[in-house]
Design a protein with these regions (language model features):
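N-terminal Lys/Arg-enriched interaction segments
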Residues: 1-119
């Protein structure tokens, strides 16, 4: 087993609850950084516009695209692991880690800002 495979199997992801977004966010960000996946969550990665463009990619570009997809799917999987069933349903249609993360930020960052203002 490679070192990266070993590292990913040891990651313990805490589950987001309705009241724990701020601490969950910090922990998930750290986990995603440690797996070199944070840039996929924040920036995404370049995707072909359609299938014909993808078919025209060079071998090197095709390999890079597949590596990017694999890493983005790994990031999405880690995010999904950190959600209970009801919260998971909010991001179930997300096709990228960036999309899932943005949905969660929209749902929960606003809630934590409102709580801060109320205090």
């Amino acid at each position: 087993m490679s070192a990266s495979a070993s590292n990913s199997s040891q990651v313990r992801v805490l589950v987001l609850s309705e009241n724990s977004y701020d601490s969950w966010y910090i922990r998930m960000r750290t986990i995603l950084h440690s797996q070199d996946l944070w840039t996929y969550v924040i920036d995404g990665y370049p995707k072909p516009v359609d299938a014909s463009v993808e078919l025209a990619l060079s071998n090197a570009d095709c390999v890079l695209l597949n590596e990017n997809r694999k890493k983005d799917n790994k990031a999405l999987g880690l995010i999904q692991q950190g959600l209970n069933e009801s919260i998971f349903m909010k991001i179930s249609s997300a096709t990228s880690s960036k999309m899932a993360w943005n949905i969660l930020e929209t749902c929960y960052q606003g809630v934590s800002k409102v709580k801060t203002v109320k205090l």
